[in-house]
Amino acid sequence: MQLLIVAVGHKMPRWIEDGFAEYAKRMPPELRIELREIKPEQRSGSRTAATVMQLEAARIEAALPKGCRIVALDERGKDLTTAALADALTGWQREGGDVALIIGGADGLDPALKARAHMLMRLSSLTLPHGMVRVLLAEQLYRAWSITQNHPYHRV
């Protein structure tokens, strides 16, 4: 099973890349994390936020593996504890197939893409920089995995 993080945005600061890479390399080979960056659409006077989100959604869809489980990050998504994320990860592994976790652009995710998602999830009630979300998501996935393995990384 592969965890694929599909994130709108590119040219992240080095510390974001390093933070993401640190947690991605900690994952076991059978549960690796891959990042696919989606070039954001430029907003102009003639393009509405809805148009931008639709164009980005088409790029996101093209990056998704066929038949993958889609988890869209959204401010109105389900607020999970780390233990609940560990339970979800266990379920995803049991069901098999890849899981794509989608981080939208500055305007968010297209409503049609969110409707297609198997799950809407939020990392925090706080507004976070999109680059930071990559690092936090990778860390939480590693922490969730560590819970499933009784690894000492996560202490209650």
UniProtKB/Swiss-Prot annotation:
Reaction(s) catalysed (UniProt annotation): pseudouridine(1915) in 23S rRNA + S-adenosyl-L-methionine = N(3)-methylpseudouridine(1915) in 23S rRNA + S-adenosyl-L-homocysteine + H(+)
**What family name appears in the similarity comment?**
Belongs to the RNA methyltransferase RlmH family.
Task: Please verify whether the record's keywords include Heme.
Answer: no
Which InterPro entries did the record assign?
Alpha/beta_knot_MTases (IPR029028), RlmH-like (IPR003742), tRNA_m1G_MTases_N (IPR029026)
Give the residues the record marks as binding S-adenosyl-L-methionine. 73, 104, 123-128
Which gene is this protein's source? rlmH
Keyword flag Transferase: yes
**GO MF annotations for this entry?**
rRNA (pseudouridine-N3-)-methyltransferase activity
Q: From the Swiss-Prot or TrEMBL record, give the protein name.
A: Ribosomal RNA large subunit methyltransferase H
Please give the organism: Ralstonia nicotianae (strain ATCC BAA-1114 / GMI1000)
State how it assembles.
Answer: Homodimer.
Q: Where in the cell is it found?
A: Cytoplasm
CC annotations in GO: cytoplasm
Q: What Enzyme Commission number does this protein have?
A: 2.1.1.177
Function per UniProt:
Specifically methylates the pseudouridine at position 1915 (m3Psi1915) in 23S rRNA.
| Keyword vocabulary terms for this entry | Cytoplasm, Methyltransferase, rRNA processing, S-adenosyl-L-methionine, Transferase
